[in-house]
Amino acid sequence: MRPMIKVLYIAMALALSCVVPAHSMSMQELQNTSRFEMLHGFGESGNGDGTYIDKDSIKASNGPNGTKQIAVTQYVLMPAGDTIQEKNVLYTFDTKQSFGNLIKRLESHQLGSYKELWLFKQKYSGVTSSVVDFKEYHIDGNRYDTQSEARDRRMATAPVDFGFAGYLLANRLYERMYGVQFDDVVGK
C-alpha cells in the first residue's frame, strides 16, 4: 500500500506542476513596446545594459507623513550573466526635499547658501527606494537557479543618490505620474 501512496503523491505533484502557470520573462517579451518601455542610460547596478519598466505596473499613492509613493516593476538586462533581473521597487518622495522647496527655504534664510543647499541635497536626495520583490531569469525566459537568485537579491538595490541614474529614473517616474519633475515641486 505504501508504494501506491508514493506513486499517487508523485503523480499529483507532476499534475499540479503542469496546471500551475509559471511567470517568466524573456528578452523577446521586453521588446513588446506596448507593455514595456526601455529607459536609456538607467542601468541600475553599474553593469546593466538597460532598464525596462512595465508600463502597466506603475501605481502612485500617498505615503506616510505627506510623502508620495510610486510602485513600479523594473527589468534590468544584465548581459554579463545573460540574465534579466525583475525588481518590484517602491519609491518614496519627500516633497519637502525637492529643489523647489529647498530654494524656497534658502530665500527665507533657513539655509545659508547655495553651497549648503547643494550639500544638503547630496546628503538627502528626498527620494528613497526599496526592492519589494526580486526575481532573476535567463535571457531565454527560464527562471534562474534559486541559490544564485537569493545571493543576487541581497545585492539588488535601486539607489537614488542625487544626480545619478536611479535619481533620474525616479524623477522620470514622478513626472509621468504627477506631470511635473520631483525637483520642481514647491509647497505653499
Mark where each language-model region is.
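Bacterial N-terminal signal peptides that target proteins for export
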Residues: 1-9
